[in-house]
């Protein structure tokens, strides 16, 4: 979909890419409705790290791109519907730390584990989805929620920059001291962990 939006000097290729994008999206949505998030079985698979909140943001972002390309209301509806899960995973109330930190995302609605960022760089998908929604559906009733999400996340990132000063790098995120208790997410994040993974995690967090 993104390629179709950017290749404006080749109408034939643009049309082909749009058709493929719609077909791929339809296939992916059909499988998702059938299997949900499914279970991964491939060893060394780094996509284990992707959280449910990120998957839902990705669905929304993809649908928004197709809506921008085609103008079909069905894509707009999907984009607005699936981002609601992601919004429910964002921390909007301040933590009880000295900075009142908020704005980050949890991996799922249970809010047991926080999204941390690794070298694969998937963190941008949350804001890509929110921004595309704001650009394509300005009259939607949820528009203020999307804007608020962007503002909260921006404040969160800016608030953390002091911890990496003067290097100008974004930290991987805040951590919950007892995330190891969320065993499903903990062992999906850390492939082939040692027997004392809980102790090692606790030591690093301290």
List each language-model region with its residue ranges.
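Glycan-recognition and catalytic cores of secretory/periplasmic carbohydrate-active enzymes
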Residues: 1-206
């Amino acid at each position: 979909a993104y390629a179709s939006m950017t290749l404006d000097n080749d109408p034939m290729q643009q049309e082909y890419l749009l058709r493929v994008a719609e077909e791929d999206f339809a296939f992916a949505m059909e499988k998702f409705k059938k299997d949900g998030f499914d279970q991964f079985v491939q060893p060394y698979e780094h996509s284990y790290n992707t959280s449910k909140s990120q998957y839902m943001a990705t669905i929304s972002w993809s649908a928004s791109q197709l809506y921008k390309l085609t103008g079909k209301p069905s894509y707009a509806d999907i984009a607005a519907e699936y981002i609601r899960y992601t919004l429910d995973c964002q921390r909007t109330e301040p933590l009880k730390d000295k900075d009142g930190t908020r704005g980050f995302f949890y991996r799922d609605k249970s809010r047991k584990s926080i999204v941390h960022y690794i070298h694969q760089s998937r963190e941008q998908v949350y804001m890509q989805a929110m921004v595309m929604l704001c650009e394509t559906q300005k009259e939607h009733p949820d528009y203020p929620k999307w804007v608020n999400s962007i503002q909260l996340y921006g404040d969160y990132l800016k608030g953390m920059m002091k911890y990496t000063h003067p290097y100008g790098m974004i930290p991987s995120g805040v951590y919950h001291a007892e995330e190891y208790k969320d065993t499903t997410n903990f062992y999906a994040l850390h492939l082939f962990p040692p027997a004392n993974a809980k102790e090692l995690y606790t030591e690093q967090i301290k």
